[in-house]
Design a protein with these regions (language model features):
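Conserved hydrolase catalytic core segment
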Residues: 1-17
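Core-facing hydrophobic residues within beta-strands of well-ordered domains
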Residues: 3-5, 124, 132
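Conserved alpha/beta-hydrolase catalytic His-Asp/Glu region
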Residues: 15-18, 24-93
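Hydrophobic "lid"/C-terminal helical patch
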Residues: 78, 117, 144, 148, ...
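Short beta-strand/loop motif that positions the catalytic acidic residue
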Residues: 94, 100-102, 106
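Conserved alpha/beta-hydrolase "acid-adjacent" motif
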Residues: 107-113
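Catalytic histidine-centered segment of alpha/beta-hydrolase-like enzymes
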Residues: 108, 132-145
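Active-site-adjacent alpha-helix of alpha/beta-hydrolase-fold enzymes
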Residues: 115-124
Length: 152
């Protein structure tokens, strides 16, 4: 708790429960898990393009990156999210200045699910990226970088 000066959490919530159906797809390395995560990770605008970088396809780039993951990596990631139960207690122990960067249209970790987490940090600031989904660093990388620099 005392070794860190600044903490930034991007696209977070508590709890981060993951559905059994998605966990089962990921456990069996079913491509459907990647399809669901890709779809749910982006805002509606990002799903149909809207990339600030011409020629880049956000959703397909994300899908391809996940397809390159080693076996069970996605499952273990989702399981860790789902099994993490001490988030509020851990937040109370943080003495560092904390910044949460949340997406307005985040379907995986909706901003209203961060409310209890926010209330348990001692020194917290929240930045919301309008129109962005869970993939904040892909959908709006420059604004995320600006917020990270502010936090330092």
């Amino acid at each position: 708790p005392n070794r860190v000066n600044n903490l930034v959490m991007i696209g977070t919530a508590f709890p981060m429960a993951v559905s059994e159906a998605l966990l089962n797809l990921a456990k069996n390395n079913d491509p459907g898990a990647i399809d669901i995560l890709t779809f749910m990770s982006f805002s509606e605008d990002a799903r149909i393009g809207n990339n600030k970088n011409p020629g880049m396809w956000m959703t397909e780039g994300t899908r391809r990156l996940m397809q390159r993951s080693s076996k069970n990596v996605i499952f273990k990631d989702l399981l860790a999210c789902s099994n993490f139960v001490s988030g509020l207690d851990r937040a109370k122990e943080v003495n560092a200045k904390t910044l949460l960067i949340l997406g307005e249209n985040d379907y995986l970790t909706p901003k209203h699910k961060a409310k209890d987490l926010i209330e348990n940090f001692k020194s917290v600031m929240v930045k919301e990226i309008k129109g962005s989904g869970h993939s904040l660093m892909v959908e709006n990388p420059n604004l995320v970088l600006d917020y990270l620099l502010e936090a330092l």
